[in-house]
Regions:
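Conserved acidic residues
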Residues: 27, 244-245, 314
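SAM-dependent nucleic-acid methyltransferase catalytic core
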Residues: 11-13, 121-247, 251-260, 275-278, ...
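S-adenosyl-L-methionine
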Residues: 1-28, 38-45, 63
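SAM cofactor-binding core of SAM-dependent methyltransferases
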Residues: 27-92, 96, 137-139, 147-155, ...
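SAM-dependent methyltransferase catalytic-core segment centered on the flexible catalytic loop
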Residues: 253-312
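Class I S-adenosyl-L-methionine
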Residues: 331-335, 342-386
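Conserved glycine-rich SAM-binding loop
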Residues: 6, 35, 251-253
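Conserved Class I SAM-dependent methyltransferase catalytic core
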Residues: 289-347
């Protein structure tokens, strides 16, 4: 799935080898800001040790649980085939089907125009339904057809392998939405953006879910893991254990991640939300807030987390861009703070990271940066006070 600051490339540039080395001595692996879960999956598929995946957002927990909480492949395609057939029946019988047909007929086979997008928004706003995405995102991130497909798939989620099915749908939606970068705002129907909306709206959600479920089904963990939807600080203080290897990849944006992934969070929660603004955001109180994504509190949050870690017999691996980021943090700052409490080994790697959807004129969507990998160990002769 698309995810801001994914460690997929960094795993191939030294992080993976480092984790292999450190996991030999660790009792568990704890991924404190798991995001898309790529690091949790990397460890879970290679070591006979428990992986704990922690994140503030529910969609992250669902994605991680689909992989790390299962120790066998899902054989055959009966589950996903039965689910999609049930969703298609629901789609065919829903009253919104006629609205989708009305919109499709008005567009025809011609290329998409601004009036087509505005008509889609009008239709999805006018006809209130009990679906999760129809009124909130139809005509914006999703076409009317796609919004109805998502709602039908949510309504018909099977009880067996429900988490894996929901994870497949979240993954598909992340690759379907008509938005630059990471769904902070949908494309507006301008002349330049219309081709991107048209391309996104042509994607079939049913086909995408089938593809993504099969990808999830063939992967699993060696040992059944655990997911925690909650705050990293609270987990460290209350659930971290001596002997854990802790992976820390905190937010680097001064904008809350819940603003970029609210569409995925809505799908994960499977509940209707009232949205507003160009980004179609839920209310502020409904979006998880992290002190690490607030420029005024990020440094304090890092310091507090490091102090809590220093009270446990653990090894921590921290990754962060070397340069100053919009939340006021940098790899250098984190390293300097960590050296007050730990012996720190520093590794530098060139990597690219998302700028949250660049426009290629002011900035590219992805930029090269130097990423620091910091290994934190307790200082020799240090007395750990719990």
């Amino acid at each position: 799935m698309k995810y801001m600051g994914s460690k997929r490339k960094l795993l191939k540039k030294g992080l993976g080898d480092l984790l292999r080395q450190e996991m030999r001595k660790a009792s568990r692996f704890v991924d404190l800001f798991s995001g898309s879960g790529v690091v949790s999956r990397f460890v879970a598929s290679r070591f006979n040790k428990k992986v704990v995946s922690v994140d503030l957002q529910l969609f992250s927990s669902v994605i991680s649980a689909a992989y790390i909480c299962r120790t066998k492949k899902i054989k055959g395609s009966v589950i996903v085939d039965t689910w999609i057939e049930a969703a298609k029946r629901d789609y065919a019988s829903s009253r919104e089907r006629a609205i989708v047909d009305e919109w499709s007929d008005s567009c025809g086979d011609k290329k998409l125009f601004k009036k087509d997008v505005l008509f889609a928004r009008k239709l999805c706003a006018k006809h209130i339904c009990d679906g999760v995405t129809w009124n909130a995102y139809g005509g914006y991130y999703l076409s009317p057809r796609q919004a109805l497909q998502v709602d039908c798939l949510l309504r018909t989620l099977p009880s067996e392998f429900r988490t894996e099915c929901l994870a497949a749908l979240i993954s598909t939606v992340s690759k379907t939405v008509a938005a630059p970068g990471h769904t902070a705002q949908p494309f507006q129907p301008t002349r330049d953006a219309l081709p991107y909306i048209e391309e996104a709206w042509r994607r079939d959600v049913f086909c995408g879910v089938e593809r993504d479920f099969k990808e999830i089904a063939k992967r699993h963990s060696r040992v059944c893991g655990q997911v925690v939807c909650g705050d990293a600080q609270t987990f460290v203080e209350e659930q971290l254990q001596d002997g854990d290897l802790v992976f820390i990849d905190p937010p680097y944006s001064g904008v809350q991640y819940s603003r970029f992934y609210h569409v995925l969070e809505t799908v994960a929660k499977r509940t209707r939300v009232t949205v507003s603004g160009k980004g179609r955001y839920p209310s502020f109180v409904e979006r998880p807030q992290s002190a690490f994504s607030n420029k005024g509190t990020s440094e304090e949050a890092v310091g507090k987390l490091l102090v809590a870690l220093s009270k446990k017999r653990v090894v921590a691996v921290v990754t962060f861009p070397c340069e100053l980021c919009s939340n006021g943090l940098s790899g250098r700052k984190i390293g300097d703070e960590a050296r007050k409490l730990f012996e720190v080994t520093e590794i530098q790697r060139r990597n690219d990271f998302s700028t949250l959807g660049g426009n290629n004129t002011i900035r590219d969507a992805r930029q090269k940066t130097t990423e620091l990998i910091l290994v934190l160990r307790h200082k020799k002769h240090c007395v750990i006070k719990s």
